[in-house]
Amino acid sequence: MSDEQTTHFGYEKVDVKDKARRVAGVFHSVAAKYDIMNDVMSGGIHRIWKQFTIELSGVRSGHKVLDIAGGTGDLTKKFSRIVGPTGQVVLADINESMLNVGRDKLIDSGVAGNVVYTQADAQYLPFPDNTFDCITIAFGLRNVTDKDLAIASMLRVLKPGGRLLILEFTKPQNALVEKAYDFYSFKILPTMGQIIAQDADSYRYLAESIRMHPDQETLKGMMDAAGFAQTKYHNMTGGIVALHTGIKP
């Protein structure tokens, strides 16, 4: 296979057409235990990262928000309260299992009326141009086959002046933190995945996918190249996670 026909599934090179199927398999496998694993593997810190994303979103009453790779609905739940009855949140996820878990979780918690659930591929968003005031994608971009295509698709469906926020694991800024993080990711995380979700391989893929994801400056450059303005990023927890933001001109 030529490089044009291949992409990375973790550290493994696979056919471009095969990556989506294999990523889907990962999330079908972990969907039921996804929230528990998030809390365990981050010590609950993921809630702080997501709250910071909400605070920087600029979302207010009446806005229309797209939560891509929204999964089990943490961001959607908070945005639903902010936009109120005159606004709308679209929870989009390419994975049916994750979408079903998210829908059930939000309905059980009383979130209804202003939330729409859509199975959608971030590379080919099924929405008209200039639809959303804000788009978020949290811990999802690294799983997308063509990240440039996805970023361009997000730009298209944002309204002028709308904001994109990408929350993602990335490259730690301190060598000691990076070394400790590598040990945790490759030794501890798969073991926890096996114990809690009976699936070590999916969490091994998670660790590998993080290492293969573009670093902070590279992702910022990709957003610039797509046409976003005022791009910047905020490192959190020593650069283990970064929040990238950009505005559609």
Curated annotation (Swiss-Prot):
EC number: 2.1.1.163, 2.1.1.201
Stored InterPro entries: SAM-dependent_MTases_sf, UbiE/COQ5_MeTrFase, UbiE/COQ5_MeTrFase_CS
Catalytic activity: a 2-demethylmenaquinol + S-adenosyl-L-methionine = a menaquinol + S-adenosyl-L-homocysteine + H(+); a 2-methoxy-6-(all-trans-polyprenyl)benzene-1,4-diol + S-adenosyl-L-methionine = a 5-methoxy-2-methyl-3-(all-trans-polyprenyl)benzene-1,4-diol + S-adenosyl-L-homocysteine + H(+)
Pathway membership: Quinol/quinone metabolism; menaquinone biosynthesis; menaquinol from 1,4-dihydroxy-2-naphthoate: step 2/2; Cofactor biosynthesis; ubiquinone biosynthesis
Sequence positions that bind S-adenosyl-L-methionine: 72, 93, 121-122
Family: Belongs to the class I-like SAM-binding methyltransferase superfamily. MenG/UbiE family.
Record-given protein name: Ubiquinone/menaquinone biosynthesis C-methyltransferase UbiE
Role, per record: Methyltransferase required for the conversion of demethylmenaquinol (DMKH2) to menaquinol (MKH2) and the conversion of 2-polyprenyl-6-methoxy-1,4-benzoquinol (DDMQH2) to 2-polyprenyl-3-methyl-6-methoxy-1,4-benzoquinol (DMQH2).
A single GO molecular function term of this UniProt record: 2-methoxy-6-polyprenyl-1,4-benzoquinol methyltransferase activity
Sorted UniProt keywords: Menaquinone biosynthesis, Methyltransferase, S-adenosyl-L-methionine, Transferase, Ubiquinone biosynthesis
Species: Saccharophagus degradans (strain 2-40 / ATCC 43961 / DSM 17024)
Highest taxon, organism lineage: Bacteria
Membrane spanning residue stretches: none
Gene3D superfamilies membership: Vaccinia Virus protein VP39
